């Protein structure tokens, strides 16, 4: 009997379009000799819509439902995703997806799911909290100032100018895929950058700009996590924003990255240490800055990285000899393993 994968995609965050791309890639790459795929779309308003089922590879004409093609007659209660023995693959990016909220819902339903648990998902989603945890683990961070809604913005700007040097990057603490992030060269640019970031979150990070290469390491496993050789994001734009990353195709990837063996070893070790520090499970992508001065800063952990067949995370593992379909199978097996352990702890 085939194993059922419940594919959750869409979602309420600004990254829902990326989620659809990732989900369509997964549904086409699944080993249909072993799996059946059932898909549920989460609309922008948070409704669950039962969409397609696939017992064999979909045709090129098959497309997943989106906000533009919703069939509201297929709206179901969120708990309708439950199926005995099924594994959920929540291909959801950003808030209300990889921030622990969906993970908590799936644990209430007693369903195995791919990826990090409630704690590690919520922790890694918040940039300020992640920095504090990684600092405690001895991992170097880019200098920053945290600003919370209600703070005296003028005083905080003065703190930024005392502790950091322009240019600086302003980021919502709880957001991903470069949404709401701005680069500021002076105070006149910093004020509107803060206003933009506060549209997406009540906690904002102002980070020192660094002249650096962006290097990424893939992580796979539960308590025996393994890392990939690093890959590099090679940009044709000054700032790797949402449109550059997902829409304009203004980046290329260099896998493996052209860096020394010593730097590779440090990055892989730091990535594995960071994954353990947050209590990670299943998968993550660890993003580093490698400066022109030879400094290595861990920028962030992404607990549900972009998962299209052309995304960095699957390509990093392909370079290590694990194909995209095999990667999906391994993640499903890891989900079942962590579920069994979680259930055993409740006895």
UniProtKB/Swiss-Prot annotation:
Keywords: ATP-binding, Cell shape, Cell wall biogenesis/degradation, Cytoplasm, Ligase, Magnesium, Manganese, Metal-binding, Nucleotide-binding, Peptidoglycan synthesis. The keyword Nucleotide-binding applies. Pathway: Cell wall biogenesis; peptidoglycan biosynthesis. Mg(2+) 1 binds at residues 287, 300. It is an enzyme of class 6 (ligase). ATP binds at residues 161-216. Binds 2 magnesium or manganese ions per subunit. It is found in: Cytoplasm. GO terms for cellular component: cytosol. It catalyses: 2 D-alanine + ATP = D-alanyl-D-alanine + ADP + phosphate + H(+). It holds the Pfam family Dala_Dala_lig_N. GO terms for molecular function: ATP binding; D-alanine-D-alanine ligase activity; metal ion binding. Signal peptide: none annotated. One of its GO terms (biological process) is cell wall organization. Its cofactor is Mg(2+); Mn(2+). Residues 131-333 form the ATP-grasp domain. Disulfide bonds: none annotated. Mg(2+) 2 binds at residues 300, 302. Its EC number is 6.3.2.4. Cell wall formation. PANTHER family: D-ALANINE--D-ALANINE LIGASE, D-ALANINE--D-ALANINE LIGASE A. Belongs to the D-alanine--D-alanine ligase family. This is D-alanine--D-alanine ligase.
